């Protein structure tokens, strides 16, 4: 829900048990991991601390930015279109170089301007098929692939989105079974209560609005 509210529930393959449940208001987030009995609370802008448990590394805002490509921020970003090439497989599974258009986005950082995003458009359909998001050190934070574009209520959207987070060591493949756009949503659809007896983990020290509902003694990272 605009501007940056997200609720996502992940299911395990085959058994279809809940792997995680996450919610974010764009600033703070909560993630419930039933298999580990962990309830993680933090801010989307908290410094990254990589956990050995990949599910604990998930941040709703990272998924949101990969799933819905952000618009160019005219105040803090400069975008330039370049001609480029990407390696694809042809009908015979041979690797070939295919020309594309690449939207290079440079962003104002804390100290200097840096390469923030690279969005790759196919010359065949003029749709974005790949997005690379970088941190200020030049590392790839997110790589997203958008495939199988389909019309949903006259809106073209990829039926498959693959999101990879190489630093944290996890990836998510989203397959659209059903997509409803611009449907009314209620506030309770974005509420995630702390389960009784859950092991609570607070990321960072400053916890505000979303975390107020979690009343257990937290662990901190």
Regions found by a protein language model. Give the residues of each.
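Generic beta-strand structural signal
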Residues: 1-2, 24, 121, 151
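An acidic-aromatic
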Residues: 2-65, 198
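Residue-level marker of positions within ordered structural domains that often coincide
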Residues: 13, 67-68, 72, 181, ...
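Short beta-strands and strand-coil junctions in structured, solvent-facing domains, enriched
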Residues: 15-18, 73-74, 152, 169
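A charged, solvent-exposed segment within the mature domains of Sec-exported extracytoplasmic proteins
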Residues: 36-109
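Gly/Pro-enriched, hydrophobic low-complexity segments
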Residues: 79-196, 201
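Gram-negative outer-membrane assembly/targeting C-terminal domains
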Residues: 189-221
